[in-house]
Amino acid sequence: MALRRGGCGALGLLLLLLGAACLIPRSAQVRRLARCPATCSCTKESIICVGSSWVPRIVPGDISSLSLVNGTFSEIKDRMFSHLPSLQLLLLNSNSFTIIRDDAFAGLFHLEYLFIEGNKIETISRNAFRGLRDLTHLSLANNHIKALPRDVFSDLDSLIELDLRGNKFECDCKAKWLYLWLKMTNSTVSDVLCIGPPEYQEKKLNDVTSFDYECTTTDFVVHQTLPYQSVSVDTFNSKNDVYVAIAQPSMENCMVLEWDHIEMNFRSYDNITGQSIVGCKAILIDDQVFVVVAQLFGGSHIYKYDESWTKFVKFQDIEVSRISKPNDIELFQIDDETFFVIADSSKAGLSTVYKWNSKGFYSYQSLHEWFRDTDAEFVDIDGKSHLILSSRSQVPIILQWNKSSKKFVPHGDIPNMEDVLAVKSFRMQNTLYLSLTRFIGDSRVMRWNSKQFVEIQALPSRGAMTLQPFSFKDNHYLALGSDYTFSQIYQWDKEKQLFKKFKEIYVQAPRSFTAVSTDRRDFFFASSFKGKTKIFEHIIVDLSL
C-alpha cells in the first residue's frame, strides 16, 4: 500500500517535471517573438525595422543599435526610446514623422550616433536633444527644416559632426542664433544653404555679413515716473556724474536730479526755489556749474553750485527791464567765449544775448523788440555762427555773427512759415536739418542745401508745442508732442530719407523732450504741463529671440 502510494508520487513528480520542461521552450519562443516583431530583424545587439508603425518594446538588454526605416508614425514623442538605455546608435531614415518633441531622446545617456535623414521633419522642439551629452555625430540631412529653435544644440557637449544638408533654411532673424553658433562652435558642420529671403537665396548662411540691422529694432519703455508737472528739462555732466534740471512752474521749483548708479534711477539732488519758473539752463565754465533760472515773475536769476554748501546759491540777477516773459534759453560758444540768449515772448520784450566775462554774465546784445519771440536756436551753417529766432508775429528770422563787429546782424528768414513756436537744429551724416514746430497746421522738417533751407517733410501736428530731434547712436528720432492726442515719435528711414511713425506715447500736455545718457543706458525725459513727468528708456530689441 505504501509502495503504491510512493510509486504514484514519483510518477506525479516526473510528469510535473516533464510538463515544466515542455513549457520552457514555448515560453522562450513567445518571449523571442515579443522581442522581435515581424517587421524587424533582430540580433543580440541590434534591431532593424522596416515599415514599422511603432518602436519595438523590447525588454532592456544589450541593444546598442536601432534602425527604423520607412516607418509610418507621425512624430517622435518624448521619451520614445527610453526603454533602450544602452543605445549607442539610432538611425531614423525615410520615415513619415514631421515633428520631434521635447525630450524625444531622454534616457539615452550612451547615445553617440543619431541619424535622422530623409524624413519629412518640419519642426524640432527646443529641447528635443536634451540630455544627449555623449552624442558625437548628428545628422538632420534631407528633411524639410526651415528653421531651428534657439539653442537646440546647447546640450550636445561632445558633438563632433553635424550634417544639415538638404534642408530649406530661411535665413531671416530666426536663423541669427544659428549664424552666431556656427561662428563659435568647434564642431564640423556642413554648409547651410539659404532658400530665402531673396537677397540670401542660394547663399551659405556662413557668408551672410550680419543680421544686426535686419534683426534688431528699438523701443521706448517707461523707466520712471516723476510725481510732478514740468515745462522744461535740461541735462549736464559734472565730475563724471549726470544731472538733470527740471523747471516746475506750479511748484515754483527748479528741481535738480542726479543719476543713482546703485538704484539705477534718477533721484533728487537739490532744489532751487523761485516764482513761476519756466526754464533751468545749466552752463559749465571751467570747473564751475551755473544754472540760469528763467521766471515769469520776480525777474530771472543765475545760480552757482557752491562746493562748501553742496547746493546751488544765487550768483546773479538778470535785469527785469530787459527780460519780462522768458520763453527759451539757448547756450552757445563763439571763439571760445560763452554766451546764452533768452527769447522774450512779451509784446515789449527784448530777446537778449548775455556773455561771460570771467566774473559774471552781462547783457551783450539786444536782438529786436515787439516781435514776441518764442524760441532761439544757435546754428552753425557752413562754418558761420547763426541764431534763428521764431516768433508769433513773423516768420523765423536768421541772424549771422559778424566777426568785425562781433554782433549778430540780420541775414535772412525762412519764408512761408508763420506762427512757428520753436526751431531746433540737428545733423545726420553731416547734413544740417531744422525742425519747426507749429501749434496749428503742419510742423516741418527742412534741410540746408548750401543756399537755403528747403522743406523735405510736413508732419500733421494739431496742438503741438514741441518737435524735438534727438539721437541715440545711429538711431535718429523726432518727438512731436500734442496737447490734443497721443504724442508721436518718428524714426529716420535711411532708405526713404524721411521720418516715419515709430511709436505713440501718452504724456499730458508735453512741453519738452530731452535725451539723457548715462551708464551705457539711454533715457528720454518727457515734461508734462498738466500731468506727471515721465522718463522713458531707449532699449534695443532683438527680433531673433
Swiss-Prot record:
GO terms for cellular component: extracellular region. Glycans are attached at N70, N186, N271, N402. Keywords: Glycoprotein, Leucine-rich repeat, Repeat, Secreted, Signal. Residues 29-65 form the LRRNT domain. GO terms for biological process: inhibitory synapse assembly. The keyword Transferase does not apply. Its main location: secreted. SUPFAM superfamilies: L domain-like, Putative isomerase YbhE. EAR repeats lie at residues 219-261, 265-307, 311-358, 360-403, 407-450, 452-494, 498-540. This is Leucine-rich repeat LGI family member 2. The gene is LGI2.
